[in-house]
Amino acid sequence: MGRIIGIDLGTTNSCVSIMEGNTPRVIENSEGARTTPSIVAYQEDGEVLVGASAKRQAVTNPKNTLYAVKRLIGRKFTEKEVQKDIGLMPYSIVPADNGDAWIEVRGKKLSAQQVSADILRKMKKTAEDYLGEPVTEAVITVPAYFNDAQRQATKDAGRIAGLDVKRIINEPTAAALAFGLDKQEKGDRKIAVYDLGGGTFDISIIEIADVDGEKQFEVLSTNGDTFLGGEDFDQRIIDFIIDEFKKDSGVNLKNDVLALQRLKEAAEKAKIELSNSAQTDINLPYITADASGPKHLNIKMTRAKLESLVEELIERTIAPCRVAVKDAGVSVGDIHDVILVGGMTRMPKVQEKVKEFFGKEPRKDVNPDEAVAVGAAIQGQVLSGDRSDVLLLDVTPLSLGIETMGGVMTKMIKKNTTIPTKFAQTFSTAEDNQPAVTIKVFQGEREIASGNKALGEFNLEGIPPASRGTPQIEVSFDIDANGILHVGAKDKGTGKENKITIKANSGLTEAEIQQMVKDAELNAEDDKKKVEFVQAKNSAEAMVHSVKKSLGEYGDKLDAGEKAKIEAAIKDMEEALKSDDKAAIEAKNAALMEASQKLGEKMYADMQSSQAAGGDAGAAAGAEHAQAKPAADDNVVDAEVKEVKKG
């Protein structure tokens, strides 16, 4: 089995980690950063940019630069959270044929899974570059409060990216693994993981116990809000700036996508700066223009103002904390440590609110940006069999059940049940001679089924005629370690059964996933060709530059015919460089190398004679001559010979 990497697929930033022995290592990306912006840009020429390069060009390409796509994954277009985002995002969110929320980019519809796969592919490549070997297996984290559809969609994104997702684990649980593994305190400890990221909020109460030398991490409860995070904080700042600018200039920036993209960057920057200073300037020259000329934006913002804008958002995190503590069967005083995860927890007001609720200072020895990826890597090591001193007992975040007579939700597995788990219950028919039953599966806490998230439905057919209440239909629920649900129904009288892995009544079909995997592989082939073309072009341009330089220095030593031949080869090469034809560039490059061979010989002979002439010119020249001697060796590179100066 190869190495299993740990990936934190975040709303705003993503991170990848690997275990080296028993030490986790967060891997720097190609730009040298330990986290990668979860931003994907689709260029006109078909190139896909991911991370910092996508972020840099967002202002000039707002409609085709996608961020915070995690907020759409596994969601229906009609959900109120999606409808809210439609009015805020510069890119186009559209309904897919199956009812999911997809994104339209350059006339093409993309699922949130495909866009997430582009980010995962970047994480995979980051790990491969570091390890120097292919990576095919990963543990990917999701918010603890993600429902079944969102978990399944994340797993599908991994498949599209070419990864075998060995486990989906909850972000707070991963952070607890990263925190608790190296702690030497004896006895059981209860910790609260408060995870406020770019798009989601989770709170988990976790017990870390030493059981016969094994660290056992048991999730006691979890709660949260999958549509609350840093993006919402940014939006409050953007709305404030728009209102202030409208008051000052009379211009409304709400419908100007270029201005909105600049405002988003400025809001994020101001939010970060105000975590460390009491005031910041938001300065955006030439933000827009009207008949009177260009307009400049300059607004001072204090930390107090920011806190007043986002106070209600921070307050919204406290109710889930209260529920999680109650569901865990503990009191706030029983909690030993509070861990903060997610970039938003750097905000002083957030830390203050957490301290106020839990009655203790949150721990400062956990990196909020990296802990989740580190925990995923630890779980990867456990799954690969390289570690046996860790046991992770996670829970299902929401109750699961089926719709029964009168539209009631009959709960089969209650929220915060440790997974994996199985449960079966016997039901009967509602009408006489009913030939089939439809099993409708829901996830949520409402008593009426329609108030919960519909996960899917299937039929059990061929029930023999009988009066209502006679047939015995056993419905079984089985949640695997990824938190993904499998449901079965069996007629006890006939032995007939039907089983499905619940895929949301939206979600991607197997055929769609296969097609997306194929598309991704084709893109990878295109990317490879692009890189090879760029390398050929760079090599040819370097050759032209080198030969031109040498021709200027030694051209007078060649006869006219040879010189003309080289000049013609240079001209051919320059013409080829104007095209996108890699084969032509390589052919002309080879021709130029051949044509300039005589020039190389003249240069070499000239150097030899100048070195011989300088042979008696004292110790310094002798030393230079000694250094130059290896040039006679067959392994000498042309470029190195050219660097030797004439005596």
Swiss-Prot record:
<dbReference type="InterPro" id="IPR029047">
    <property type="entry name" value="HSP70_peptide-bd_sf"/>
</dbReference>
<keyword id="KW-0143">Chaperone</keyword>
<dbReference type="InterPro" id="IPR013126">
    <property type="entry name" value="Hsp_70_fam"/>
</dbReference>
<dbReference type="InterPro" id="IPR012725">
    <property type="entry name" value="Chaperone_DnaK"/>
</dbReference>
<dbReference type="InterPro" id="IPR018181">
    <property type="entry name" value="Heat_shock_70_CS"/>
</dbReference>
<dbReference type="GO" id="GO:0051082">
    <property type="term" value="F:unfolded protein binding"/>
</dbReference>
<protein>
    <recommendedName>
        <fullName>Chaperone protein DnaK</fullName>
    </recommendedName>
</protein>
<dbReference type="GO" id="GO:0140662">
    <property type="term" value="F:ATP-dependent protein folding chaperone"/>
</dbReference>
<keyword id="KW-0346">Stress response</keyword>
<feature type="modified residue" description="Phosphothreonine; by autocatalysis">
    <location>
        <position position="200"/>
    </location>
</feature>
<comment type="function">
    <text>Acts as a chaperone.</text>
</comment>
<dbReference type="InterPro" id="IPR029048">
    <property type="entry name" value="HSP70_C_sf"/>
</dbReference>
<keyword id="KW-0067">ATP-binding</keyword>
<keyword id="KW-0547">Nucleotide-binding</keyword>
<feature type="region of interest" description="Disordered">
    <location>
        <begin position="606"/>
        <end position="647"/>
    </location>
</feature>
<dbReference type="InterPro" id="IPR043129">
    <property type="entry name" value="ATPase_NBD"/>
</dbReference>
<dbReference type="GO" id="GO:0005524">
    <property type="term" value="F:ATP binding"/>
</dbReference>
<feature type="compositionally biased region" description="Low complexity">
    <location>
        <begin position="612"/>
        <end position="630"/>
    </location>
</feature>
<comment type="similarity">
    <text>Belongs to the heat shock protein 70 family.</text>
</comment>
<dbReference type="Pfam" id="PF00012">
    <property type="entry name" value="HSP70"/>
</dbReference>
<keyword id="KW-0597">Phosphoprotein</keyword>
